[in-house]
Amino acid sequence: MTIKEYDKFDKANANFQALTPLSFIERSAKVFPNHPAVVYGENQYSWRELFDRTIKLASALTKFGIKRGDTVSILSANTPEMIEAHFGVPMSGAVLNTINTRLDSETIGYILNHSDAKVFIVDCELAPEAAKAIKTIKNQNIFCLLYTSDAAD
């Protein structure tokens, strides 16, 4: 079936569901709760587990004081925590600012200065470069959260 043929059908629950990233993860957790969502090395997370972890991150950010429109930056490789940030940060109402792990500390500092990040999430493996970047930023009130990629919670 081509897209043109598909588009001729009236939109109904059976053939159409508008999806934003947040409604996508919520729907996936309901429809496919036990199906794998993330496979990372030996670790595997179902859609339900990913959704639950995403809610925990959003809740933690909100309790910390992050509000709609605030910026949360993250310096991380493609890990499960990065996936959680892609859903959890917008779920809290904040804007996610992902920073390329190949950048030098001066450039990371520049990005942090111009993003006005309130929180900076950093993979522990990248902490030395992040520490150098933090020394260059004007906003000394930024909260830095370090995590390990193999953390279970």
Language-model-derived ranges and their functions:
Residues 1-18:
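Flexible, non-catalytic linker and terminal segments flanking ANL/adenylate-forming cores
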Residues 27, 53, 72, 84-88, ...:
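Residues within well-formed alpha-helices
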Residues 16-17, 22, 26, 34-79, ...:
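Conserved AMP-binding/adenylate-forming core of the ANL superfamily
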Residues 33, 148, 152:
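Conserved adenylation A10 loop of the ANL superfamily
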Residues 63-64, 91-149:
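Structural core segment of the AMP-binding/adenylate-forming
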